[in-house]
Amino acid sequence: IGNFNSESTYKPIDSDELKSILATTGRGYYIVAVLGAGQEPTNHALRDIAALGKDFDEWGRGIVLLFPNEEQYKKFRPQEFPGLPATITYGIDTDDSIRKEIVQAMNLNNSILPVFIIADTFNRVVFVSQGYTIGLGEQLMKVVHGL
């Protein structure tokens, strides 16, 4: 349904060095999201994913959850979402470049978060979701099981 460059870089929370999505997730499929910390659509999405945390862990692929900036990340409280998969890497979307790339490639509204995609390292996007989505965890899993 579109393209996303898996060589796009972000700043992992535990590092000052930029890292590519590909270097984080390895080859194959992965999930990338740009979140709005403390915003209800993002909280809802994270609760949906946490509810299926075991399924995502079994899938075993990388999930990269990005925040627009450090300030947003500091507002994030992972303990509010027990059950989030262990395969998550948190980071900062430096210069807003990843969100911009997804929004442009998928013709999405520029200002609405969260944005989730499932893509592969051949840069093919197979799923996209933006804003408030009921049952996002189930939708993601449905696509994952179809891969």
Residue ranges and their predicted role:
Residues 2-30, 37, 47-51:
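A short beta-strand-turn-helix
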Residues 12-14, 87-98:
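Short acidic-hydrophobic, aromatic-tinged amphipathic segments that line or gate anion-handling sites
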Residues 30, 37-84, 97-103:
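Structural microenvironment flanking redox-active thiols in thiol-disulfide oxidoreductases
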Residues 85-89, 104-117:
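Structural micro-motif
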Residues 111-147:
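Thiol-/selenol-based redox modules, centered on thioredoxin-like
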